[in-house]
């Protein structure tokens, strides 16, 4: 893909120049794969940040990296939520579930996301709607343009200003709450029945 090609070039360039490649995987970490976006695109960063999924709903943030970098210099960092026992225990259980594949099934999440996007896009194209479902793995978004977009700048350029907020309000009228950022993050709790109901509501609104 274009993204994978870009990341590979970025990895090569950073290596040649002696610059650390840092991935922000706060959103994508443990969502796109057990190694996040780095695993999905088969790129090894030097440092990576994690959050959200890692805490299983509790506040958390973590930094990981290659051993020789992490051991270069020890840093003391204190904060209100630092090393919170409940968050740490939740993270332990999450990591165990990912490593042992006891609960989180990435192939199932990927299939759910792809089905969501394919079915909606087929509907939008069939009915000549300037709307598309985009995303990667279990991360999805509805965009109100049929133009190809690669980033936030493209979306802001092609998508009507109030489209997302109006759409979210309409979904709430159908008892569907979408996060303020407009992203649909599917989890193992979202059954096929729940996703089909979501697809049906989106079709009715659009």
Where are these predicted regions, by residue range?
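Conserved N-terminal phosphate-binding loop of PLP-dependent enzymes in the Aspartate aminotransferase
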Residues: 1-206
């Amino acid at each position: 893909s274009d993204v994978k090609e870009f990341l590979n070039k970025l990895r090569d360039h950073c290596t040649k120049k002696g610059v650390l490649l840092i991935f922000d995987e706060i959103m994508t970490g443990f969502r796109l794969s057990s190694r996040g976006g780095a695993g999905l695109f088969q790129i090894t960063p030097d440092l990576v940040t994690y959050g959200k999924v890692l805490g299983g709903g509790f506040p958390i943030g973590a930094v990981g990296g290659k051993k020789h970098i992490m051991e270069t210099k020890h840093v003391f960092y204190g904060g209100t939520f630092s090393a919170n026992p409940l968050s740490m225990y939740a993270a332990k259980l999450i990591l165990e579930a990912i490593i042992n594949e006891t609960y989180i099934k990435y192939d199932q999440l990927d299939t759910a996301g792809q089905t969501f996007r394919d079915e909606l896009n087929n509907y939008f194209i069939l009915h000549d709607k300037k709307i598309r479902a985009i995303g990667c793995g279990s991360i999805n978004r509805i965009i109100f343009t049929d133009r190809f977009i690669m980033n936030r700048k493209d979306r802001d350029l092609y998508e009507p200003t109030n489209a997302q907020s109006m759409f979210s309000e309409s979904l709430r009228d159908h008892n569907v709450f979408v996060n303020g950022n407009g992203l649909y993050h599917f989890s193992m709790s979202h059954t096929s029945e729940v996703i089909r109901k979501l697809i049906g509501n989106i079709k009715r609104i659009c």
